[in-house]
Amino acid sequence: MSIPRMKSYFSLIAAVLMLGQVATAQAENLPDFTGLVEQASPAVVNISTRQKLPDRAIANQQMPDLEGLPPMLREFLERSMPPGSRPPGAGKGDRQRETQSLGSGFIISPDGYILTNNHVIDGADEILVRLSDRSELKAKLIGTDSRTDVAVLKIDGKDLPTAKLGNSNTLKVGEWVLAIGSPFGFDHSVTKGIVSAKGRSLPNDTYVPFIQTDVAINPGNSGGPLFNMAGEVVGINSQIFTRSGGFMGLSFAIPIDVAMDVANQLKASGKVSRGWLGVVIQEVNKDLAESFGLDKPAGALVAQVLEDGPAAKGGLQVGDVILSANGQPIIMSADLPHLIGNLKDGSKAELEVIRDGKRQKLTVTVGALPDEGQEMGDVAGTGAERSSNRLGVSVIELTAEQKKSLDLKGGVAIKEVTGGPASLIGLQPGDVITHLNNQAITSSKQFTEVAKSLPKDRSVSMRVLRQGRATFITFKLSE
């Protein structure tokens, strides 16, 4: 072999060896989950429920967890279910008289207290818990909280394996996390991923700052624990965002600090109490920030103040932007309900607000969150008609009865949308305009005057009441 060819040969060998060393180094840097799984698995349980339903309800019931699965997998899962819980048409065609759902949970005390999701056991007539040794026990429901989707169960036992609880506040974005649960009934399945974001706000989940991860979560994982690399529970896997019905890389967990606060209250009294301001708030976007004179989008915009509520008594007004509560900044509007919800009835909330472009501080005595929301009436007015072609709406006065029903001192109702900005921003007949360009509307005449003087060089805000729900919207007039 010639010297040049020998040099090429040895160079190739050296390159292969270097690649092997790099691959080995990368493998050594990846986390080893085996010890964590061995330590944590015994405390994770499978939860199954049975619910008796009328024949008609059962005949119409779908089983979405099995829909769309490959035939062999669907058949396997149907065979593994008790005969009474199989979907319509399964087996010999017997009419189904009870339904079954599957979920996960974890033991938090040696005497048998278990955490899971409310939606896992909601409406159940019987709750069964299967432990890691495959033994099954009936569980007693201690309490539930639908607002956070947390439930506490109790099984009879002693010296049971328990999950080690961590601190979700110290969790960092990018940190490795691991889930153990029963997706589709496959007990103690392990999946891993990283924390994608913290403090996520989801629709209809006002009181939970969710942990977002890319851990694979599927039906049956709900209620199971999310672990950090120290083997500590940092969250309860609760829901996913999906367009297909299956996992798409967006999973959400309830922080364990939130869950344990709820659990401790449920164990003590069977119910959960939360602080309450009595306001309806919305996000401050770029255009709203501009219209209210803010440097950047931040805070919670007060769209509605409930009569005789804590906020009304404390002097909070529609159009105020709440920037902080007890020194804690309100970055997103969803931060406010969580901060106030953690306060006790009768405690003080020091609020920093922007009003008419100026900062000021208010002290509000926090109330107790009521069980049900307060409803406001619809609008169907018959008053004096005015129009404003600049906005593209025809408006009418509210009657005295309508003002009383809606708890309003003024405002005008939209009779017709004729085009212009009103059409672009989605205004509808029956909407009530209570504020325009940061001014309270007291009559249709004043509304027309304010509309004529609207600026064209910046965003303009408008407060609209629709079916009892108030919101601020923004628009710009064309040149």
UniProtKB/Swiss-Prot annotation:
Instruction: Give the EC number(s) under which this enzyme is classified.
Output: 3.4.21.107
Region Disordered, residue ranges = 77-99
Check the record and name the InterPro entries matching this protein: PDZ, PDZ_sf, Pept_S1C_Do, Peptidase_S1_PA, Peptidase_S1C
Subcellular locations according to the entry: Periplasm
Q: Which SUPFAM superfamilies does this UniProt record tie to the protein?
A: PDZ domain-like, Trypsin-like serine proteases
Question: What Pfam families does this protein's entry cite?
Answer: PDZ_2, Trypsin_2
This enzyme catalyses:
Acts on substrates that are at least partially unfolded. The cleavage site P1 residue is normally between a pair of hydrophobic residues, such as Val-|-Val
Record-annotated PDZ domain positions:
266-357, 363-468
The answer to whether keyword Protease applies is: yes
What residue range is the signal peptide? 1-27
Note the superkingdom of the native organism: Bacteria
A single GO BP term for this record reads:
proteolysis
Q: Does the keyword Repeat apply?
A: yes
CDD domains from the entry? cpPDZ1_DegP-like
Binding-site list for substrate: 220-222, 277-281
Q: Main subcellular localization, coarse class?
A: periplasm
Query: Could you name the active-site residues?
Result: 119 (charge relay system), 149 (charge relay system), 222 (charge relay system)
Keywords in alphabetical order: Hydrolase, Periplasm, Protease, Repeat, Serine protease, Signal, Stress response
Recorded GO cellular component terms are:
periplasmic space
GO molecular function per UniProt? serine-type endopeptidase activity
Which family would the database say this protein is a member of?
Answer: Belongs to the peptidase S1C family.
Per the entry, what this protein does is: Might be efficient in the degradation of transiently denatured and unfolded proteins which accumulate in the periplasm following stress conditions.
Record-linked PANTHER family: SERINE PROTEASE FAMILY S1C HTRA-RELATED, SERINE PROTEASE HTRA2, MITOCHONDRIAL
Name of the protein this chain belongs to = Probable periplasmic serine endoprotease DegP-like
